[in-house]
Structure formats: C-alpha cells, structure tokens
C-alpha cells in the first residue's frame, strides 16, 4: 500500500484542473500541462484537492497511484512556481553563453557546442561559468540539464566538467610512483 497515494494534492487558488477520463490538464499562471494517467489509478477532484485510489484488478495499482500523485503534484508546483536547475562549468576555458533558445558551450573540444533547448525552457547565464534553466515541466528541465551535463561530465581527478550546482564530485588521489 502506498502512503504517498493516500495524501491528496492540494490545488491552490488560481489553478484550474480538468479531468477528462484518464487525461488530466492543469492550468496555472505559468502555463498548462497535460498528462495521461495509468489505467490502474482513479483520480477524483473533491473541492480543492485531487484524491487517488487504486482500481481493482491491477497488481501494481497502489504503486501506480503513488507515482501518479507525485507526478500531478509536480505539475501543480510547475504551473504555480516553476522549476529551476543550476549548472556550473568547472575548468580552464570552459564557458557558456545563451542566445535565444540555444546554449553555446566551449568545453575544451576543437569545436564549440550549440545545444538547442526544448520548447518551454528558458536559459540564462548569470556568469560565463553558470547556466540556469527555468521551466514548468520538471521532467523536461531535468532531461535538458542532463543533456548539457553529458557533453563533459565531471572527471574524478580534478573535477573538471559540467556539474549540477548542488552536486559534490568525489575526487580520486593521483597515481603515486
């Protein structure tokens, strides 16, 4: 039994929720998100909250209900507050710049990298070694940050590379003679 699914998702003022079978749309001041819910989950809107119940006949219904609750809660937070992800570039000559929807990276390769951001995500560079991604959809933000990090992951000897702002890179000791 999922303890997560038992807690309702509170719908704040200014957020509109539409239930159409298994398709749920959540609209707020930052935008609108839509998601199709798994068949094993029953979603009911009561007053200003969404409640979740498992449907009979599905083996993993409680697990799906907990997952659905977490996903819909992230959607509500996204359309009200939004999500941010911060990246740092550590290394000599590693730089970033943003032009429109394209992030230009200089990461020590023989060529510059131009990364096209997905729709609905904005990026800004407070400094040449920092990138801040903002958006409504938590999954898309995380994937965009992971794609940028994948160009040059932090290496374990000096820690150079693209890392999340809150990431702690464990460094190894150099080989001794």
Swiss-Prot record:
Biological function: This protein binds to the 23S rRNA, and is important in its secondary structure. It is located near the subunit interface in the base of the L7/L12 stalk, and near the tRNA binding site of the peptidyltransferase center.
GO biological process: cytoplasmic translation
Molecular-function GO term, any one: structural constituent of ribosome
Any one cellular-component term (Gene Ontology): cytosolic large ribosomal subunit
InterPro entries given in the database record: Ribosomal_uL6-like, Ribosomal_uL6-like_a/b-dom_sf, Ribosomal_uL6_a/b-dom, Ribosomal_uL6_bac-type, Ribosomal_uL6_CS
Record bears the keyword GTP-binding: no
Any coiled-coil regions, as ranges: none
Protein's UniProt name: Large ribosomal subunit protein uL6
PROSITE patterns per UniProt: RIBOSOMAL_L6_1
Family: Belongs to the universal ribosomal protein uL6 family.
Annotated organism of origin: Buchnera aphidicola subsp. Acyrthosiphon kondoi (Acyrthosiphon kondoi symbiotic bacterium)
Keywords: Ribonucleoprotein, Ribosomal protein, RNA-binding, rRNA-binding
Residues that span the membrane, as ranges: none
Quaternary structure and interacting proteins, as annotated: Part of the 50S ribosomal subunit.
Pfam families found in the cross-reference section: Ribosomal_L6
């Amino acid at each position: 039994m999922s303890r997560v699914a038992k807690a309702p998702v509170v719908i704040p003022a200014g957020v509109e929720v539409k239930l159409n079978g298994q398709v749920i749309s959540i609209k707020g001041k930052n935008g609108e998100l839509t998601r199709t819910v798994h068949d094993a989950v029953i979603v009911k809107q009561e007053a200003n909250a969404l409640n979740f119940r498992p449907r009979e006949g599905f083996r993993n219904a409680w697990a799906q209900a907990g997952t659905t609750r977490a996903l819909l809660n992230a959607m509500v937070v996204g359309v009200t507050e939004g999500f941010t992800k911060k990246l740092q570039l550590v290394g000599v000559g590693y730089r970033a710049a943003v032009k429109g929807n394209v992030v230009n990276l200089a990461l020590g390769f023989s060529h510059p990298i131009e990364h096209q951001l997905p729709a609905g995500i904005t990026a800004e560079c407070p400094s040449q070694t920092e990138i801040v991604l903002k958006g409504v959809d938590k999954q898309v933000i995380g994937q965009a940050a992971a794609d940028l990090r994948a160009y040059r992951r932090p290496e374990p000897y000096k820690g150079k590379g693209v890392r999340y702002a809150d990431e702690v890179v464990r460094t190894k000791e150099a080989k001794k003679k």
